[in-house]
Amino acid sequence: MTSRNINLNTKDTDVSAKKVPFLLKPVGKDYLWGGRRLNDEFAKDIDMEPLAETWECSTHPDGSSIVASGEYEGKTLDEVLKEHPEYIGTQPHLQAKGELPIMIKFIDAKSDLSVQVHPDDDYAREHENGQLGKTEMWYVLDAAKDAHLIYGLYHNTKKETLRKSIENGTLEKHLQKVKIKKGDQFYIQAGMIHAIGAGALIAEIQESSNLTYRLYDYDRVDKNGNKRELHVDKALEVANLKSSKEPVQPMRVFKYRQGCASELLCHCKYFEVFRMIVNTERCRKLVGYQSDAASFRVLLCINGCGSMVMQDGNVLNFFKGDCIFFPADSVKVRIHGKAKFLDVRC
């Protein structure tokens, strides 16, 4: 994370400083379908070409975020949470795991992603060495005019029918394609066959899992000239082969308070996601925000910029693309600026 994101005064330090929010530096992934937008538009400054994903909030073994401000700067988020498990929260399902149960990403799809499916927790626990499955939620940050997603199947089908269609290159006739636009949201339950299409810029909130079973990858080759591995047997074992209803975008229902509006985007057993819009340019009162003891929270800034004023007067500046982690039972901050966030809770 570059220094532009951090402006912490050092008036004094005390025990309460350990409960202040901190910035996270992401891990980058250079999958072949990625582009340049995360560096160009979100100032990620990651030396990868292409840059397909940034894991903004992650403690996964395949890539942990790095703390980029405050007392723990330079440590991995995984290290910090192992030192301070109380930062995760008091809810029983969080304490039972003792680790971060979710991951938050930005995804830049310059090309189509593979047609894929993720296992649920039970299957992953039994067949993938106790790992989590993967249910996820997508929020569309931007989309090309013709951008689309694959969202399940058009009709009920059978394993062998899909297997044959993969072998003869006709899988796409079974797939439900959905046009997308900026601001759309989609809930992708484990077992749903899906794919992000070219031209989509996505924020993804998901279980902390990197398990993906590919059904079809357009016969592409990687930088070494090799086709990427398919996982057809496992994919067909976990896939929901019933037709999926075409998703309908919900009516927007905002809750307002001075300088702030918020709406619930997604509620499931794994996470809650709100969209929060802050604009204090025309009001004297800053927007208060903090986590409670039950769970950590994460604010992902998807547009705009501003600052967070701590109780001791220290200031944390944030910009578009920044990810801020709030330990459970955090100090209260006052937010000033004009910005949009995804507000993630467990």
Residue ranges and their predicted role:
Residues 283, 304-309, 323:
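Short beta-strand segments in beta-sandwich/barrel cores
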Residues 99, 107-112, 143-146, 192-212, ...:
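Ligand-binding loop in jelly-roll beta-barrel domains
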Residues 165-214:
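Loop-centered beta-sheet repeat module
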Residues 213-289, 293-296:
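C-terminal amphipathic alpha-helical segment
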Residues 156-168, 294-305:
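Short, basic/aromatic beta-hairpin or loop at an interaction surface
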Residues 175-187, 310-330:
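Short acidic-glycine-tyrosine-enriched beta hairpin
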